[in-house]
Swiss-Prot record:
It is found in: Cytoplasm. The keyword Plastid does not apply. The lineage of its organism: Bacteria, Pseudomonadati, Campylobacterota, Epsilonproteobacteria, Campylobacterales. This is Probable transcriptional regulatory protein HPG27_148. Its main location: cytoplasm. Keywords: Cytoplasm, DNA-binding, Transcription, Transcription regulation. Belongs to the TACO1 family. One of its GO terms (cellular component) is cytosol. PANTHER family: TRANSCRIPTIONAL REGULATORY PROTEIN YEBC-RELATED, TRANSLATIONAL ACTIVATOR OF CYTOCHROME C OXIDASE 1. SUPFAM superfamilies: YebC-like (SSF75625). InterPro entries: Integrase-like_N, TACO1_YebC-like_2nd/3rd_dom, TACO1_YebC_N, Transcrip_reg_TACO1-like, Transcrip_reg_TACO1-like_dom3, YebC-like. It comes from the Bacteria. Pfam families: TACO1_YebC_N, Transcrip_reg. It comes from Helicobacter pylori (strain G27).
Length: 240
């Protein structure tokens, strides 16, 4: 399954170091959402979700407010761009970026791939068909229980809102649906008054691959360089 950058980073970095790197990416998502749909979360579902995700990462309110205000300034001139690449061992990579300078972004990404023998950026559209786009929501199991709902009740309640799969992972419940069902699923959570812990649009590989430890170690070097770029807000691979 393709993995978004925040899940991989959480496993390999300390909490404060993680925060220092994730905040700029979260701020960009908030700024772009406010620029596209207005600065009022009540009428802008994309902004509401971006703020929710920022709060889940303990981003301070002042940072969130500043990111919203930035949408009306020159600093808010951001665009969303996706790039694709290949690495050794059959690894496929999709990079979702938010940038105010696409020339800088692609130059940086190319430099990371050029430092890795056998890796290269490929034309957009070359790999996209090998990933399914999904809406993914997370909530706490305890919040479901607070509503006097079983997981079966929750699944039944959200089917009409586009739910395709429900999975229990530790103390969390993961809800997946079609990419185009994101807004509808969000409305489903709101109708149930069930707090969302995190919400995102993800790319999941149709044919995931497995790497051995040595292959993974070599591949991680490239993935780490990409993830550390402030313009990259999400990274997906076909690694199991």
């Amino acid at each position: 399954m393709g993995r978004a950058f925040e899940y991989r980073r959480a496993a390999k970095e300390k909490r404060w170091d993680k925060m220092s790197k994730v905040f700029p990416k979260l701020a960009k998502a908030i700024t772009l959402a406010a620029k596209d749909g207005g600065s009022e979360p009540d009428t802008n579902a994309k902004l509401r979700t971006a703020i929710l995700n920022a709060k889940a990462q303990n981003m301070p309110k002042d940072n969130i407010d500043a990111a919203i205000k930035r949408a009306s300034s020159k600093e808010g001139n951001l665009s969303e761009i996706t790039y694709e690449g290949k690495a050794n061992f059959g690894v496929l990579i999709i990079m979702e970026c938010m940038t105010d300078n696409p020339t800088r972004t692609i130059a940086n990404l190319k430099s990371y791939f050029n430092k890795t023998q056998g890796a290269s950026i490929v034309p957009n559209g070359s790999l996209e068909f090998m990933f399914n786009r999904k809406s993914v929501f997370e909530c706490l199991k305890s919040e479901v229980e607070n509503l006097k709902l079983s997981l079966e009740d929750l699944e039944f309640a959200l089917i009409d809102y586009g739910l395709e799969e429900l999975e229990e992972v530790g103390d969390k419940v993961i809800i997946r649906g079609d990419y185009n069902s994101f807004k509808l699923l969000n409305e489903g959570f709101e109708s149930l008054k069930l707090p969302i812990l995190k919400a995102s649009l993800q790319r999941i590989a149709t044919t995931p691959i497995e790497l051995n430890d040595e292959q993974m170690e070599l591949t991680e070097k490239l993935l780490d360089r990409i993830e550390d770029d402030d313009d990259v807000v999400a990274l997906y691979t076909n690694i199991e």
